[in-house]
């Protein structure tokens, strides 16, 4: 598991990080449903829009598996979360943001 990897590193060398598991601290913004603007996220999939990882302020897309939908539905906007996730795409096609697949999530103070 990678710790301390920045989103900027993923964007700079996306192939190096694809498939890697990492731990990130993020700020939750909203739960969204994927559309055509995010082709790296399966159409209709639930994902989190988040900022980070701390101390960065760029956006990250966190794809949520069905088993975790109830957990993320209870998150308050701007909550600090720590996730373990697998890198799907280090730099998304249109917007350039990392896309990761959620494995675990904890709310942090």
Residue spans for each PLM region:
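OB-fold and OB-like single-stranded nucleic-acid-recognition modules
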Residues: 1-109
């Amino acid at each position: 598991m990678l710790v301390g990897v920045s989103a900027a590193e993923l964007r700079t060398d996306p192939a190096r990080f694809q498939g890697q598991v990492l731990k990130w601290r993020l700020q939750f913004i909203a739960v969204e449903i994927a559309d055509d603007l995010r082709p790296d996220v399966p159409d209709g999939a639930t994902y989190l829009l988040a900022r980070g990882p701390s101390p960065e302020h760029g956006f990250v897309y966190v794809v949520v598996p069905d088993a975790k939908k109830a957990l993320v539905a209870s998150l308050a906007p701007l909550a600090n979360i720590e996730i373990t996730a697998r890198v799907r795409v280090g730099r998304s096609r249109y917007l350039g943001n990392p896309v990761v697949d959620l494995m675990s999530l904890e709310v942090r103070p």
